[in-house]
């Protein structure tokens, strides 16, 4: 292996500064939009049911009572967004490695903004047309959100220093918690305003303006994302992509010097040359060909297949109980609020959003912050195992006495505490670590793609959990209207707990630890093991030759102005023949 490029070492050792926190906010907006979209849909569907499923078309067919959105429609609105997220993870993850993180980052944000606005701007007033329009734009929203997952994690991992990389990526992911909180706040504000404006209508009286309320809630999710578009587009390409994928050390150094105030270009260059002087001169000076093996090639599977399986499988197993628990909220909050027949559409949506805000403040956000504090102390692997174990314990505690006790005592503090601890454990452990690990384990040229594949597996698990749980939680002999008979809530919770134990076992067997190591060290350890198995067949001096030649250019460029630096770089056509500009 060639010695490490010093600009990347300097990036690993850089002090935490303003730009790191700015990057957290910029990168976190996609996750913010994701959780806003996921959690606002429950209260939105309450209003939607009152508007488009009037009492005469209620689910039970009695012609009385408030309109209710059928379970199949709820599943469709959730499922299309998750399917879009699967596609977005795969497509934008691959594009992030092929054309650069920055180039497709803005496209994801624009797609999220436009589809959020489109979700509420449907001009249709009939039920079928409104549903078709809503599902179409929610699919596009899912594509944008899914694409943001690998790009946000990869960009933050490549900008962060070694000491706080895990905490920074966890901070990006914690924006989901604030998305839940803002979603609840916006829903409560809109519902309260419309309720007051319409004179607090009777429970079965749904004003025509309610059709506007749910649209405003959906469109409001575009505002925070739109506000960060300028800063997202002004970000430079990550140094690791520029240096390791585009193989342009000079430009990488220049880009990082613009955003990290304490990076001394001349000092970095001097360290590079000093390190090169201590190394034996390279045998070969021409640049080597770009790495020949591709994604899913035999060599890729040998070197990275185990890690990709560990990341994708853990994320898949996590999202089944995590998204199922999100849908389980309806069972939790129902005893605490008046029945739907005694409140109007705005009040029902307000109550659902209020409960979601309580859960977010009590368990979800504290779980994210606990992960940020512990990720660099306990490590990713230990936190993931601990989180899976705690989730299983709390789900079993809910499942065991459910039929005999919890079903008739749902309005107790212990019931909500156990449910909240399930969310806390997920966010403390696997919900955060499954987002971090794929951004640390893979080489720069596969990093975004592999993160996207892992995230896509997670969204498939979410699809299984969100749709499967709606069926499985129904009683065999007493399914709710619009549902097929299932296995019952108690057995459904037991299954979710068992899935968490399976995630624990998989993490123990397959997941490596990445704490305290640079991204290049994580990659080197995998390649070294592969080279030992191959008898060192991948060793060579070609990369040393390329690096030795670039060091001289780097030393010269560090003492020049940016204009001279660009001119010097452009004259290096024999070294980087495919690069035409900075």
From Swiss-Prot:
Residues 45-75, 125-130, 187-210, 329-354, 407-415, 473-485 are extracellular. It is a multi-pass membrane protein. PANTHER family: SOLUTE CARRIER FAMILY 22 MEMBER. Although related to the sugar transporter family, it does not transport sugars. The chain crosses the membrane at residues 24-44, 76-96, 104-124, 131-151, 166-186, 211-231, 308-328, 355-375, 386-406, 416-436, 452-472, 486-506. Expressed at low levels in roots. It comes from Oryza sativa subsp. japonica. Belongs to the major facilitator superfamily. Phosphate:H(+) symporter (TC 2.A.1.9) family. It is found in: Membrane. It comes from the Eukaryota. Residues 519-541 are annotated as: Disordered. InterPro entries: MFS_dom, MFS_sugar_transport-like, MFS_trans_sf, Sugar_transporter_CS. GO terms for biological process: phosphate ion transport. One of its GO terms (cellular component) is membrane. Pfam families: Sugar_tr. PROSITE patterns: MFS, SUGAR_TRANSPORT_1, SUGAR_TRANSPORT_2. Residues 1-23, 97-103, 152-165, 232-307, 376-385, 437-451, 507-582 are cytoplasmic. High-affinity transporter for external inorganic phosphate. Its main location: membrane. This is Probable inorganic phosphate transporter 1-9. Keywords: Membrane, Phosphate transport, Symport, Transmembrane, Transmembrane helix, Transport. One of its GO terms (molecular function) is symporter activity.
């Amino acid at each position: 292996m060639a010695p490490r490029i010093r600009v990347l070492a300097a990036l690993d050792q850089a002090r935490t500064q303003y730009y790191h926190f700015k990057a957290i906010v910029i990168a976190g907006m996609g996750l913010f939009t994701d959780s806003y979209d996921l959690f606002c849909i429950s209260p939105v569907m309450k209003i939607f049911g009152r508007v488009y499923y009037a009492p005469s078309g209620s689910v039970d067919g009695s012609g009385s009572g408030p309109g209710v959105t059928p379970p199949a429609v709820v599943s469709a609105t959730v499922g299309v967004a998750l399917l879009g997220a699967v596609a977005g993870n795969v497509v934008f993850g691959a594009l992030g490695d092929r054309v650069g993180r920055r180039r497709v980052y803005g496209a994801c944000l624009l797609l999220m903004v436009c589809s959020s606005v489109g979700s509420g701007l449907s001009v249709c007033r009939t039920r079928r047309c409104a549903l078709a329009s809503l599902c179409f734009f929610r699919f596009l929203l899912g594509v944008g959100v899914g694409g943001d997952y690998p790009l946000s994690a990869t960009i933050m991992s490549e900008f962060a220093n070694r000491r706080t990389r895990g905490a920074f990526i966890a901070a990006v992911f914690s924006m989901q918690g604030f998305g839940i909180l803002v979603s609840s706040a916006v829903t409560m504000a809109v519902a309260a305003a419309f309720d007051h404006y319409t004179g607090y209508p009777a429970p079965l009286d749904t004003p025509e303006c309610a059709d506007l309320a749910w649209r405003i809630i959906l469109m409001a999710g575009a505002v925070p994302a739109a506000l960060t578009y300028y800063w997202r587009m002004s970000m430079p390409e990550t140094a690791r992509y520029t240096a390791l994928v585009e193989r342009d050390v000079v430009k990488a150094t220049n880009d990082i010097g613009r955003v990290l105030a304490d990076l001394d270009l001349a000092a970095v260059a001097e360290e590079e040359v000093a390190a090169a002087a201590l190394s034996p001169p390279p045998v070969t000076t021409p640049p080597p060909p770009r790495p020949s093996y591709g994604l899913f090639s035999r060599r890729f599977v040998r070197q990275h297949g185990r890690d990709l399986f560990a990341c994708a499988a853990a994320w898949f197993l996590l999202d089944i109980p995590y998204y199922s628990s999100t849908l389980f909220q309806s069972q939790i909050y129902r005893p605490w609020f008046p029945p739907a027949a005694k409140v109007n559409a705005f009040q029902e949506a307000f109550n659902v959003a209020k409960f979601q805000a309580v859960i977010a403040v009590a368990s979800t956000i504290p779980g994210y912050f606990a992960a940020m504090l512990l990720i660099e102390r306990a490590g990713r692997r230990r936190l993931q195992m601990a989180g899976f174990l705690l989730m299983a314990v709390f789900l079993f505690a809910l499942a065991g006495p459910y039929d005999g006790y919890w079903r008739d005592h749902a309005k107790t503090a212990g019931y909500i505490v156990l449910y909240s601890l399930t969310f806390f454990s997920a966010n403390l452990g696997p919900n955060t670590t499954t987002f971090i690990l794929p951004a640390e384990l893979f080489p720069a040229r596969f990093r975004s793609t592999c993160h996207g594949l892992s995230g896509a597996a997670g969204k498939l698990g979410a699809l299984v959990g969100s749709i499967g749980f709606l069926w499985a939680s129904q009683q065999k002999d007493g399914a709710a209207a619009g549902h097929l008979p299932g296995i019952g809530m108690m057995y459904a919770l037991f299954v979710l707990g068992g899935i968490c134990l399976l995630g624990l076992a998989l993490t123990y067997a397959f997941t490596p630890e990445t704490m305290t190591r640079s991204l290049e060290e994580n990659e080197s350890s995998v390649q070294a093991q592969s080279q030992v198995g191959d008898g060192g067949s991948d060793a060579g001096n070609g990369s040393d030759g390329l690096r030795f030649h670039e060091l001289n250019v780097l030393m010269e460029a560090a003492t020049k102005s940016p204009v001279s630096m660009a001119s010097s770089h452009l004259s290096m056509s024999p070294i980087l023949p495919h690069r035409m500009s900075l």
